[in-house]
């Protein structure tokens, strides 16, 4: 999973979201990750709270964040710290605590939004997105999947035009997309001359590989993708690799669209030779529709056009091979 570390701060928070982590070990790896891989410096209360969570002191972490919020109820860093407590509780499978803390985080953030837009800076949208994500996953874990979807869809109505839209949509898809018709792909613009057409995909199993030009994990995963395409392509598998512009190249923000397109094309040529024969639709609407707040995101679609796997983050060849074997069966 790529945590948006290569995106300049002004742009980074618009597209970043933490990948859902099923177990405590995965969460601890994130909690102990270098600060350079996180949003901003995240010193102070966020760092101390995350350290307490890594030490499995969830109560102490919560008390620390709440004390900071008593002193300054609208402090963005303290709100983000509290959201991390909910994430830590979820990773530790303490679902009741995760739900309670995430609800508290949401309530506190909503109470200060009359003072500022959600996207005035990066930390509050990260905290609110995490609050909804943790609530949804905790509710689902407690057997209340319908309530989780109601929560997420209500949040989408209110925040569907903000930076947390893709994260909310991702969580809706995690709970409900399997077995449903694949969301349509926007194909008005492609990166290369290879076009995605209905004729090329009708009745074919699909692997959708959502990637970003700055994404290190995507560059690593393409080796796995190349191996699997060579193995399953002759059996009918079609690979599609949607991407989008992000408005930056390295540390430069507000890059013109044509210049960024050239940069994406050069990145594709250098790091993704496999994608020379793969359609690459270029549109932010595809990322919005599929809830891509994590790159890569992988989606497997069967011959009937139904989604069988929706996975934010990297998968190994060992994980993908049995899924693809089932997918390509006539």
Language model region names:
Residues 69-78, 108-125:
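Flexible helix-coil transition and linker loops at the boundaries of alpha-helical arrays
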Residues 142-188, 199-202:
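N-proximal helix/coil linker or "cap" segments that precede and/or mark the start of modular domains
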Residues 43-67, 71-72:
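Alpha-helical segment of the N-proximal tetratricopeptide repeat
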Residues 219-271, 279-286:
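Structural microenvironment flanking redox-active thiols in thiol-disulfide oxidoreductases
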